[in-house]
């Protein structure tokens, strides 16, 4: 079996259907004995250039190990699904399991946001305690 990196863009109005599409497409790949090494749903993102007058799309990245026949079947499914705006399948030399730069950046943003949210809350609680002590005196 060979290793592939697959990226596909879904119409932004069909974002709710993406989990079902991912399940269907991973089913095609694993049915032939394939294995999913990495699956990342990047969500709605800005496009570099408009596609069919759309400026945003829902991005999905998969790194898989499967047969060439199942990849052909997947590409056919992409072609016949009108919600898939673009797709790209690249053959890779080895399995890639680490998080992509996009996912790493998102994780860093999420941790930074959560720490920023905690800091003002801690300051606010200290202020409330101080004001309670001042009024108690």
From Swiss-Prot:
One of its GO terms (molecular function) is small ribosomal subunit rRNA binding. Pfam families: Ribosomal_S6. Residues 104-137 have a biased composition (Basic and acidic residues). Keywords: Ribonucleoprotein, Ribosomal protein, RNA-binding, rRNA-binding. The keyword RNA-binding applies. Residues 96-137 are annotated as: Disordered. GO terms for biological process: translation. The keyword Glycoprotein does not apply. GO terms for cellular component: cytosolic small ribosomal subunit. Coiled coil: none annotated. It comes from the Bacteria. Binds together with bS18 to 16S ribosomal RNA. Belongs to the bacterial ribosomal protein bS6 family. This is Small ribosomal subunit protein bS6.
């Amino acid at each position: 079996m060979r290793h592939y990196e697959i990226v596909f863009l879904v119409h932004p109005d069909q974002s709710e259907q993406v989990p079902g599409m991912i399940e269907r497409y991973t089913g095609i790949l694993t049915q032939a004995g394939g294995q999913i090494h990495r699956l990342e749903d990047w969500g709605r993102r800005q496009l570099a250039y408009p596609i069919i007058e759309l400026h945003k799309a829902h991005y999905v990245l998969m790194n898989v190990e499967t047969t060439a026949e199942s990849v052909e079947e997947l590409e056919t499914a992409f072609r016949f699904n009108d919600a898939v705006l673009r797709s790209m399948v690249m053959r890779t030399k080895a399995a890639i399991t680490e998080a992509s730069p996009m996912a790493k950046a998102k994780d860093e943003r999420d941790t930074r946001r959560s720490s920023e949210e905690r800091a003002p809350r801690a300051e606010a609680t200290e202020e409330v305690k101080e004001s309670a002590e001042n009024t108690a005196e």
